[in-house]
Amino acid sequence: MINVNLISKPKWFVEMNPSGKVPTILYNNQVYYESLAVCDLLDEVFDTSPKLNPESAEEKAKIKMALADFDTVIRHYYTLIRSTKPMEELQEMKEKLENSLKPFELKLLEKLYFNGNSGPGMLDYMIWPWFERLAIVEMFHPDLCQVMNSSMFPKLVTF
């Protein structure tokens, strides 16, 4: 494993992967990049247990749909942190972000992980980093209340 400086990517890395995206792996002389593609490949190629993805095509499709739904969370997150609008509009943006998180709170009502109770799976690993990033909103907008608080999102906060 090689850590790559994302601001100043080494020449060899950009030559290997012109998109410059991470994570990137070289497997069987082929370059693969993007988190989901890399994780899917590793899950299929290496015989590890437990698998990140379920065996059933239907369950895999549900994961892909949930990831597509999570794009709304990501969009609202970036809209909020990049905004220079007045507080009233920031509050509206924050509410949109919180509303986009609500379906994910509901998915966790009866289980510990999106994958179930036995441990995290692909969906858990793909969206977890975004929950860490939510704390950054307060750095950009100190007067805005915490985005993901335990009274509104007890399951997601625990997750």
Model-derived regions: residue spans:
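GST-like domain detector, emphasizing the conserved glutathione-binding G-site
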Residues: 1-119
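General N-terminal targeting signals
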Residues: 16-18, 48-50, 69-70, 137-139, ...
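Extended, well-ordered alpha-helical scaffold segments
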Residues: 92-96, 147-159
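Short basic/hydrophobic patches in alpha-helices and adjacent helix-turn junctions
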Residues: 106, 133-136, 158-159
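GST superfamily/GST-like fold recognition
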Residues: 117-142, 148-154
